[in-house]
From Swiss-Prot:
Gene: smo
Ranges of the Extracellular topological domain: 32-258, 309-339, 403-421, 491-532
Source species of the chain: Drosophila melanogaster
Any one Gene Ontology BP term: regulation of stem cell differentiation
Molecular function terms from GO: G protein-coupled receptor activity; identical protein binding; patched binding; phosphatidic acid binding; phosphatidylinositol-4-phosphate binding; protein homodimerization activity; protein kinase binding
Protein known as: Protein smoothened
């Protein structure tokens, strides 16, 4: 009991209190560790926790325990239990700041060492600024856990040191893609940039398990969308609204008003043209005028596509998608076809209009060159094929590449609003083609018309000259305006291409500024670089003005007359107006129906032309210089079927530089037609009087050749043959056929018309004498217009001076007359005429007629020989000779030359160079006969040279020409040249006669008739009075 010392009781109580306090501290530490979710056990301060340094950085990798056996996780494929830490200073969070973006943090200690802030208040203010990322929806959902792991990380003591848990590098990379629009801006500080030094790889973080509100909002001018194709670049979940943000609301109203007015005017203008063509389609359906109709039709349909946006709710339906974003990359699934329909209406028909414009320039160029209408009409099917198929190919290509984009400010869908390279290839490419091809044809056509205008003195009609001037002005103005509009449109497109990137970048900066300053009271964000509304207005004006310019082709008096006739017809007051057709068009119509004439024996043609087309482009350059009237006489109409039977038939051919007198290729075989100046005598009976009309025509020498080979021959062979024919015509050499004797004689007569135009020169047939006699026959001309009414005195003097020369040329000529009533045909021939006219004094008032008697003298003998040579040459004018016959011919000619060497020496000198292919051809420039036509002013003459009737190989056509003044024909020749020409003619006749006798062939007609018929063609002698009657009898 002694050891019990009660006074020591207070010491025991003190010891118990200390023990209880220690137990409470340990229990509290355990509870705190469980509260923060730490995997570190209560003995974390112990030295048994393993920390692995990461690549020599300040970061450590912490491996958690696997389970009861306390084995760590070293499996590299599972990083859920691997955490990364770094030494830091921890601070306890309060209840007010223990949240992050509205979610409560699962720990109470945090650290500021991962940021650049020094106080918790600064950190919270900056964290609130990141609420602006809600306007980048995809970014907002991905970046909230990362921001909480950086701004408010978990912090605790490990092995006795404060350690902060780090977010992983993968966690940082997740936020880069949806937040890329702001990632490289000042909105994201450097400590938020993904870096493996700051954020180790393959680490877990507790913040990833936190729940956040990830709902984002799209900031105007963006709208939310779930279609990835509609996302604005850099802002996933939002797309640009349908209304173009680069233009203000006021600018939208201006553009819509301009499209409405300009489109309506263009629509009405094109509708007027289309209606004008429809009401008079029969007269207007001719090229190139009908091309204007198709151009205006294309612009009309395109204007309809432009104006459809003004119907109720159509604009939004055309250019906007269902989610409110702008349409692009159409066609797409799930959307209506309104955008595609508008695209086809606008793009397809505008492109077709451009192609038709090129064809307009092409056809107009050919018309200005003077080519016939049929040559252009035959290409009509090709025009349609190209004009409608080429735009179709471009349209299908555009839709196949999904390059149809909408544009809200213009209210249509078009090609390449986003992909400018596609717009350059599918729009600007065809425009450049229009400029190049159309400009080429317009330039050539204008040069031709300017050439006609320059030589306007050759055009006798003032209206024709004014018509050329009007055509030049119309086409020139149209071409100039079209060129300007296309160039301005191309310039507008190029301006858009150049500045599109600047506008896009400026809009992007505007979006970033609005997102960054969303919580500012007064925002200073605006689009720095925007497209000019003036350029867009100019572009639209050029487009619609082009359609209006194309409609001006119908702003002519012809269109007004067309509407007048239409209105009178609808009101029951139609007036039949007949428009007479020019003679050359009647001949062309007759030739086109020659098959009907051959099969049925009768022909029905139209002598009245249609009215002028509304455009006025169906002009004929060949008509501009024509001085003939539209009056068609019965004689001319009766002779018209004969024109069909003859190749190269031209009646009423005009003089001048017209190109319509080119040869008509009417035969399958090669044709060579040489048209020279003709003088022929036509005897007509008008009432009781007998008249002799002399007509002078000047026609260009043309060679029309067609290959004899098969139709399948190459084009190079045809070009070579045409080149040879042209060279032969230019040099006067003919390698395949020779001219008939009648053709040579016609050339002789024609060239001597112009030898002595003055009265003082007396050569050959016609002589110009005293002024009284000139006045006398001039007065007689007044009896009948365009005919030389010669009284007996003039005719007597004519025969006295020239009878010994003109009658031989009438030898062997078929003077025929035909009648449509009884289909009768009579033919008489005047052969071997040896007439000498007795010269006598005739007073001015002497009208007793002509006194003729036969006086044999020395001249008659020479004339008989001359006539025999001509007769023999006419009988063998179309005979072909073989090489052997040519040799025998040359032998016989050598024998005859020995008898008369002096007469034939000049012939060999002048004609040997024209011998080619065993045929002889003497050019018209070297065959001259002493003629003088000075006394027959304003006279008319027609003759027919019948070599080989109905032959398909060679025909010579001497046709009626318009009147010309012989005094204006300047060329003259000397006496030596005339004598030389006569020698050439005589020698040619002798050689042909010898060749005919050698071959026993005669003419082709004689060969067909046979021996008995040949005897019937022997010359018969007639009395002088009968011969003169045959000369003066009327003949058609």
């Amino acid at each position: 009991m002694q050891y019990l010392n009660f006074p020591r009781m207070p010491n025991i109580m003190m010891f118990l209190e200390v023990a209880i306090l220690c137990l409470w501290v340990v229990a509290d530490a355990s509870a705190s560790s469980a509260k923060f979710g730490s995997t570190t056990p209560a003995s974390a301060q112990q030295s048994d926790v393993e920390l692995e340094p990461i690549n020599g950085t300040l970061n450590y990798r912490l491996y958690a325990k696997k389970g009861r056996d306390d084995k760590p996780w070293f499996d590299g494929l599972d990083s859920r239990h691997i955490q990364c830490v770094r030494r830091a200073r921890c601070y306890p969070t309060s209840n007010a700041t223990n949240t992050c973006f509205g979610s409560k943090l699962p720990y109470e200690l945090s650290s500021l060492d991962l940021t650049d802030f020094h106080t918790e208040k600064e950190l919270n203010d900056k964290l609130n600024d990141y609420y602006a990322l809600k306007h980048v929806p995809k970014c907002w959902a991905a970046i909230q856990p990362f921001l909480c792991a950086v701004f408010k990380p978990k912090c605790e003591k490990i092995n006795g040191e404060d350690m902060v848990y780090l977010p992983s590098y993968e966690m940082c990379r997740i936020t880069m893609e949806p937040c890329r629009i702001l990632y490289n801006t000042t909105f994201f500080p450097k400590f938020l940039r993904c870096n493996e030094t700051l954020f180790p790889t393959k680490c877990t973080n507790g913040a990833r398990g936190m729940k956040f509100n990830g709902t984002g909002q799209c900031l105007s001018p963006l709208v939310p969308t779930d279609t990835s194709a509609s996302y604005y670049p850099g802002i996933e979940g939002c797309g640009v609204r349908c209304k173009d943000p680069l233009y203000t609301d006021d600018e939208h109203r201006q553009i819509h008003k301009l499209i409405g007015w300009a489109g309506s005017i263009c629509l009405l203008s094109n509708l007027f043209v289309v209606s004008t063509f429809f009401i008079d389609w029969k007269n207007a359906n001719k090229y190139p005028a009908v091309i204007v109709f198709y151009i205006n039709l294309c612009f009309l349909i395109a204007c309809v596509g432009w104006l459809l946006q003004f119907t109720s709710g159509s604009r939004e339906d055309i250019v906007c998608r269902k989610d409110g974003t702008l349409r692009h990359s159409e066609p797409t699934a799930g959307e209506n076809l309104s955008c595609i329909v508008i695209f086809v209406l606008v793009y397809y028909f505008l492109t077709a209009g451009m192609v038709w414009f090129v064809f307009l320039t092409y056809a107009w160029h050919w018309r200005a060159m003077g080519h016939v209408q049929d040559r252009i009409d035959k290409k009509g099917s090709y025009f349609h094929l190209v004009a409608w198929s080429l735009p179709l190919v471009l349209t299908i290509t555009t839709m196949a590449f999904s390059e149809v984009d909408g544009n809200s400010i213009v209210g249509i869908c078009f090609v390449g609003y986003i992909n400018h390279s596609m717009r350059a290839g599918l729009l600007l490419g065809p425009l450049c083609g229009v400029i190049l091809i159309g400009g080429y044809f317009i330039t050539r056509g204008m040069v031709m018309l300017f050439g006609l205008k320059h030589f306007a003195n050759d055009i006798k009609s003032t209206s024709a000259s004014n018509k050329i001037h009007l055509i030049i002005m119309r086409m020139g103005v149209c071409a100039l305006l079209t060129l300007v509009f296309i160039l301005v449109a191309i310039a507008c497109h190029v301006t858009e291409f150049r500045h599109a990137d600047e506008w896009a970048q400026s809009f992007r900066q505007f979006i970033i500024c609005k997102i960054s300053s969303v919580f500012e009271e007064k925002s200073s964000c605006r689009i720095e670089n925007r497209p000019s509304v003036g350029v867009l207005q100019l572009h639209l004006l050029c487009l619609f003005s082009s359609g209006i310019v194309m409609s001006t082709w119908c702003w002519t008096p012809s269109s007004i007359e067309t509407w007048k006739r239409y209105i009178r017809k609808k009101c029951g007051k139609e007036v039949v107006e007949e428009v007479k057709m020019p003679k050359h068009k009647v001949i062309a119509q007759t030739w086109a129906k020659r098959k009907d004439f051959e099969d049925k024996g009768r022909l029905s043609i139209t002598l009245y032309n249609t009215h002028t087309d509304p455009v006025g482009l169906n002009f004929d350059v060949n008509d501009l210089n024509s001085s003939e009237t539209n009056d068609i006489s019965s004689t001319w109409a009766a002779y018209l079927p004969q024109c069909v039977k003859r190749r190269m038939a031209l009646t009423g051919a005009a003089t001048g530089n017209s190109s319509s007198h080119g040869p008509r290729k009417n035969s399958l075989d090669s044709e060579i037609s040489v048209s020279v100046r003709h003088v022929s005598v036509e005897s007509r009976r008008n009432s009781v009087d007998s008249q002799v009309s002399v007509k002078i025509a000047e026609m260009k020498t043309k060679v029309a050749s067609r290959s004899r080979g098969k139709h399948g021959g190459s084009s190079s062979n045809r070009r070579t043959q045409r080149r040879r024919d042209y060279i032969a015509a230019a040099t006067g050499k003919s390698s395949r056929r020779r001219e008939s004797s009648t053709s040579v004689e016609s050339q002789v007569i024609a060239l001597k018309k112009t030898t002595y135009p003055n009265a003082s020169h007396k050569v050959g047939v016609f002589a110009h004498h005293s002024s009284k006699k000139q006045h006398n026959y001039t007065s007689s001309m007044k009896r009948r217009t365009a005919n030389a009414g010669l009284d007996p005195s003039i005719l007597n003097e004519f025969l006295q001076k020239n009878g010994d020369f003109i009658f031989p040329f009438l030898q062997n000529q078929d003077m025929s007359s035909s009648s449509e009533e009884d289909n009768s045909r009579a033919s008489q021939k005047i052969q071997d005429l040896n007439v000498v006219v007795k010269q006598q004094e005739i007073s001015e008032d002497d009208h007793d007629g002509i006194k003729i008697e036969e006086l044999p003298n020395s001249k008659q003998v020479a004339l008989e020989n001359f006539l025999k040579n001509i007769k023999k040459s006419n009988e063998s004018n179309s005979n072909r000779h073989s090489r052997n016959s040519a040799r025998s011919q040359s032998k016989k000619s050598q024998k005859r030359h020995l008898k008369n060497p002096a007469a034939d020496l000049d012939f060999r000198k002048d004609c040997v160079k024209y011998r080619s292919n065993d045929s002889l051809s003497c050019s018209s420039e070297e065959l001259d006969v002493a003629l003088d036509v000075g006394s027959l002013l304003n006279s008319s003459f027609s003759g027919i040279s019948m070599g080989k009737p109905h032959s398909r190989n060679s025909k010579t056509s001497c046709d009626v020409g318009i009147q010309a003044n012989p005094f204006e024909l300047v060329p003259s020749y000397g006496e030596d040249e005339l004598q030389q020409a006569m020698r050439l003619l005589n020698a040619a006749s002798r050689q042909r006669t010898e060749a005919a006798n050698e071959d026993f062939g005669g003419t082709e007609l004689q060969g067909l008739l046979g021996h008995s018929h040949r005897h019937q063609r022997e010359p018969t002698f007639m009395s002088e009075s009968d011969k003169l009657k045959m000369l003066l009898l009327p003949s058609k």
